[in-house]
Amino acid sequence: MEKSSNRFLSIQTYMELLQEAQNKTQHKYVKDFITSYNFVVLPITENIGHRASIYIEEYSIPSGLRAGDAIIAATAVENNLTLISSNIKHFKSIKDLKFKGFKP
């Protein structure tokens, strides 16, 4: 992976990565990866929270969108960023989201 100063991560994504760690060594690996590739962790703002709640109302039933993914999508939209994820099912239907899906 090429280093760049243009990498952003929702605080929600960061917390999900840490949550999946099995031990402190894996926590350190996640933190070191985020730091070494210059990711900027974006906070949850009032606007992100509001937009995420709208996404839940609109997309939770038809696409199964959950709160964490709504926060991630809202963070991307509020910061005018393209969201890149393999979670195509939950994100592809969000109309105002710039989304690029991939298969791992």
Language model segments and positions:
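Short, flexible helix/strand-to-coil boundary loops that buttress conserved ligand/catalytic motifs
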Residues: A21, K95, K103
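Histidine- and aromatic-rich ligand-binding microenvironments
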Residues: S10, L65-R66, N87-I88, K103-P104
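PIN-domain endoribonuclease scaffold, especially VapC-family toxins
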Residues: M1-S63, A67-L81, K98
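Flexible glycine-rich beta->alpha loop in the catalytic core of nucleotide-sugar glycosyltransferases
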Residues: T82, K89
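Short, active-site-adjacent cap segments at secondary-structure transitions
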Residues: E16, H90-F91
